[in-house]
Amino acid sequence: MLNKEEIIVPKNLEEEMKESYLRYSMSVIISRALPDARDGLKPSQRRILYAMKQLNLTPGVKHRKCAKICGDTSGDYHPHGESVIYPTLVRMAQDWAMRYPLVDGQGNFGSIDGDPAAAMRYTEARLTHSAIFLLEDLDKDTVDMVPNYDETKYEPVVFPSKFPNLLCNGSSGIAVGMATNIPPHNLGELIEATLLVLANSQTSIEDILEVMPGPDFPTGGIICGTEGIRSTYYTGRGKLRLRARMHVEENSDKQRENIILTEMPYNVNKSRLIEQIAELINEKTLTGISDVRDESDKDGIRVVLELKKGESSEVVINRLYKFTDVQVTFGANMLALDKNLPRTMNIHRMISAWIRHRMDVIQRRTRYELNKAEARAHILEGFLKALSCMDEVVKTIRESSNKEHAKQQLVELFSFSEAQALAILELRLYQLTGLEADKVQKEYSELLEKITYYRKVLAEEELVKDIIREELQELHKVHKTPRRTRIEMDAGDVRDIEDIISDESVIITISGDDYVKRMPVKVFREQKRGGQGVTGFDMKKGSDFLKAVYSASTKDYLLIFTNFGQCYWLKVWRLPEGERRAKGKPIINFLEGIRPGEQVAAVLNVKRFEQGEYLFLATKKGVVKKVSLDAFGSPRKKGIRALEIDDGDELIAARHIANDEEKVMLFTRLGMAVRFPHDKVRPMGRAARGVRGVSLKNEQDFVVSCQVVTEDQSVLVVCDNGFGKRSLVCDFRETNRGSVGVRSIVINQRNGDVLGAISVTDCDSILLMSAQGQAIRINMQDVRVMGRATQGVRLVNLREGDTLVAMEKLSINTESVETEENLAASVQSGQDTIEE
C-alpha cells in the first residue's frame, strides 16, 4: 500500500545504469581523483589544509593533534570518515613522498621502509611555509567560495597558490577510465621556466628544458636519459627510467668491493627492495653478492651490498638494474583538471594554466584592495570635512537626542553619507586634535596614490605580470634549493651488460701467483729511452713477481691460453680494475676448471670471431699449430682444448693471423730466430698436436716469443738486463719451418738472455716491466734500427738485482706524446697484439 506522497517512476535498467555510472564517474574525476591545474591539489587535500588554516595552525604556532584536524575536516568539509582523511594528511607530511611537504608533522609519520604512521591520536601537525604560500590572500576574495556539503560553512574551490604546486609536488591518482601521474620538480628551476613563459607566451619547450632539465624527485636518485623527459614535456606522457644512486667502496679487507646505495628511486620501498635482493640471492639470480645490510640512520640512507671476492661490481650493478627495483619506470601522465575538465597537458600548457590562475588571483586581490581603499578614503574624506567645521559638527551631535538622530542630522545638515556619519560618531575626542588631523590627511593622500595604482593594475595586464614576476623572484631568492635528482644524459637501456661498460684501452697484468688486474693505459706516462720509469706493480722482496703484461680494449674478447693448452673465453671488463701498485685478484676467480699447476701462458684479444682468420700457437719446445679463429667462438664454462701438449712441454704464445701476407717469427732464449710464411703450417683442429716450428740449439734453449710480422716492420729484441735492439724484419733471412734460424742478438753477460721479441713500427711504444715492479714506456722513434747481430743499447736502467720479466707493444698515432692525457687518447683500441 503506497502513501500519497510516494511516486514510482518506471525506468529502463540499462539507461539508469548508464546515467548513474556517468554521474559517479564525473564525481570521481572532478571531486576526488584528479588535481586542479591551478593549485595542484585534490579536494581532500585542499579541505585538510583549509581546516588547518581555520584552526590557525601556521608554522609558528604549537602543533595540534591530527585527530582534531581530521575530525574538523570530516565534520565541516569532507564527510568521508577520519580513517580516510588521515592517510592523505600523513602523505602531505612525508618528505620522501612530497618534494615540498605541505604539512609539518610531529611524531611517527611512517618511513621510506613502508612503516605505517602512528595513530592520529598520537601524532600532531601544523602547516608548512609551502602551504602558507598556497593559502596566502585567501581572505581577500581571490577565489570563489562555495557552501560545504551541509551548507553550514563555506570552502574555497581552489587556493590562490603563490607557486605552481602541481609541478612542484606532482600528483598521482586513479579516476574512472583515466589516471594521472605527474612528477615533482625543483622550485627554483620551475620558477625560472615560469618566468620564461610569463615573459613570452610563445616560449618553446626547448627553452624550458634549458632552465628546467627534468623532474626532481624528493628521494633523489638518477633519471636515465632525456628521451622520457622530452616526451613528457612535449606530449604530457612519457616513461622516465629512475635508478638508485650508488657508488662502489673497497672492503676493509682490500680484497672485495661493496656497492653502497645512498638514494632510492621515487616510490620505491627500501625495506622491500632489500627483501627483493635477498630473495634473488637465494634463487641464485644474483650470484655476486655475499651479504646485504641496511646501515641507514638519521643522517641518510646507506644500503651495503657486499660482493664476493673477485666479483665485478659493474656486472652486479647491471643485474641489479635488470632484476630489482634499483631501476624502475615512472610512467608520467600529466593529466589535471583545467577549467573543470580533465586534460592531458604538456609542460608549457600546465605552466600557462597556473599563470592564468595567478593573474586572475592578482586581479581579484587588487580589486578587493581597491574597494577597501576607496571605502577607507570615503571615510577619511568625511573626517577631513568634519575637521574643517568641527564646532558645528560637535554642536549638532550634542543637540541630538540619540545616535540615530545625530546620524540623520549629520547627513541632512552637512551632506555626509551614512557611512561617514557613523564613522564621525565613533570618533574619540583625542582624534579631534590638530596632530590627528595631520595623520588623517597623510593617510588620505597615501590612499589616493594606492587607488591610482590599483586602478592602473586592473587596466594594464602587463602590470599584473610584473607583480607575478616580483613574487616569483622573491620566492626564488628565499626558497631555492639544490636539485636532488641527477640526470644522466648518456644512460640507456640495459639490454646487455656491456651497455654500462665504457670502451677504453687498458693494460692487463698477471703475476707469478696468477693475480690479475686491469689498468687504464693513461696511468703509464711515456718517457725517453733510458729512463727509470714508474712503479707499475708493487712487490715486496721475496714475494710475488710480475709474470706478464698485455694490452686490450675493455669490450674485447679475451682468449686466455694456459700452459696446459687449454683456452678460456672472457670479456676484458670482467677483470678487476686496480691502481698501478695494486696486486689484483686471483685469475682462478674468473676461470672455472683450472687444474693444479695450470697457469696463464698467453692471452689474445679479438673483437669478433671471423672465418678465414687463424690463431697461431707456439710451445716452449718449438711446436706450432694453426687453427681457424671461429673454432674458438663458442666458449664453454670450463674452457676448451686448444692444443695437445707433449710431456715436459707447455704453451707460451698465441697469435692472430688476419691475411696471407703475414709471416711467423719464433725467437729463442739463446738469441736465435726463425722466419717463415704461415702457410707453411696447414690449418688443424683444436685437439691436434701441431708440427715442428723451430729446432732448438740445446736443452737449455727454448722459445720465448712468437710474432706475426710483415716486411715493412721491424722487431725489438729485449734481454733480461734491460738491453735491447731494434732490427728490420727483412734482415732476418726467411728459412724453412723447423730450422735452427739465424742470430737475433748477441748473448753475453751484459745483455743477459733474451726475454722476448716483438714486432714494432715508428708509431709504436713499448711497455717494459721488471720483477720488482718497475715500469717504463718507450717510444720506438727513440730506438734506432741496428744490425741483426749487434749487442743493442740500454733500454731501461734497472735497480741492482732487478731484471725485466715482461714487455708489451702499445700502438700510438702521434709522433710525440708527453702527457698522460695525450697518451691515453692515442692508443688504438683493440689493434694491439699481446704476448708474455
From Swiss-Prot:
Where does this protein reside within or beyond the cell?
A: Cytoplasm
Q: How does it assemble?
A: Heterotetramer, composed of two GyrA and two GyrB chains. In the heterotetramer, GyrA contains the active site tyrosine that forms a transient covalent intermediate with DNA, while GyrB binds cofactors and catalyzes ATP hydrolysis.
Source species, domain of life? Bacteria
**Additional free-text comment from the UniProt record:** Few gyrases are as efficient as E.coli at forming negative supercoils. Not all organisms have 2 type II topoisomerases; in organisms with a single type II topoisomerase this enzyme also has to decatenate newly replicated chromosomes.
Q: What is this protein called?
A: DNA gyrase subunit A
Q: Which family does it belong to?
A: Belongs to the type II topoisomerase GyrA/ParC subunit family.
Protein function: A type II topoisomerase that negatively supercoils closed circular double-stranded (ds) DNA in an ATP-dependent manner to modulate DNA topology and maintain chromosomes in an underwound state. Negative supercoiling favors strand separation, and DNA replication, transcription, recombination and repair, all of which involve strand separation. Also able to catalyze the interconversion of other topological isomers of dsDNA rings, including catenanes and knotted rings. Type II topoisomerases break and join 2 DNA strands simultaneously in an ATP-dependent manner.
* Topo IIA-type catalytic domain segment(s): 34-500
Q: Where is this motif: GyrA-box?
A: 527-533
Q: Enumerate the InterPro entries for this protein.
A: GyrA (IPR005743), GyrA/parC_rep (IPR006691), Gyrase/topoIV_suA_C (IPR035516), Topo_IIA-like_dom_sf (IPR013760), Topo_IIA_A/C_ab (IPR013758), Topo_IIA_A_a_sf (IPR013757), Topo_IIA_dom_A (IPR002205), Type_II_DNA_Topoisomerases (IPR050220)
Mind telling me which GO cellular component terms the entry cites?
chromosome; cytoplasm; DNA topoisomerase type II (double strand cut, ATP-hydrolyzing) complex
One GO molecular function term of this record is: ATP binding
Which reaction is this enzyme known to catalyze?
ATP-dependent breakage, passage and rejoining of double-stranded DNA
Q: What is its main location?
A: cytoplasm
Q: Which NCBIfam families does the record match to this protein?
A: gyrA, PRK05560.1, PRK05561.1
Q: Which SMART domains match?
A: TOP4c
Which keywords fit this entry according to its UniProt record? ATP-binding, Cytoplasm, DNA-binding, Isomerase, Nucleotide-binding, Topoisomerase
Q: What Enzyme Commission number(s) does the record list for this chain?
A: 5.6.2.2
* Example of a GO biological process term: DNA-templated DNA replication
Active-site residues from the entry: 122 (o-(5'-phospho-dna)-tyrosine intermediate)
